[in-house]
Amino acid sequence: LLRASVLLVLVAAACATPEPQPITYGVDQCDYCRMTITDERYGAELVTRTGLVRRFDSPECLAAYTHEHPEEEVHSRWVTDFRRPPRLIRVEEAYFLHSPNLRSPMGLNLTAFGEAIEQEAVLNSFGGEILSWDGVLGLVGREWIESGTGPSMHGPGAMPAHAH
């Protein structure tokens, strides 16, 4: 009976749907730029099909990682809802504000929001432009990947001057 119970637990765990995990701010390290994740309004995660969770300190690091690792078997990508931290939302359901008046940890000034109804208020408060996840991928591709000015995965020493 004990063996059957253990086997059942193992099978259930193996069949579990991969999902995001809480980010431990001040402890977890960004899987892209290697900085410690400190701002609870900007954390992001990538969950693989096998359940591995990769953590990021900003939407732009998640997008850059996505560009540089197209082979990753992704189950889902998540970003923190700026107005409701530490709530994680799927990137497909989020909208992103690109505004110099709302600085993100890596300096590309991308902030995720979860409620579409808030778009007008957010634009009125901060200015800028609203992007979809595809828009974020395009922006990061142009600003960091193609230009070669984004942080590399080789640590903080390779970070651009505008990042902090």
For the regions a protein language model found, what residue spans apply to each?
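Sec-dependent signal peptide recognition
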Residues: 1-8
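Mid-length scaffold segments of soluble, non-membrane domains
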Residues: 55, 59-88
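Bacterial signal peptide processing site
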Residues: 16-18
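Histidine-centered metal-binding segments
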Residues: 151-164
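Thiol/selenol-based redox catalytic cores and closely related redox-interacting motifs
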Residues: 75-147
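Post-signal-peptide N-terminal segment of Sec-exported extracytoplasmic proteins
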Residues: 26-68
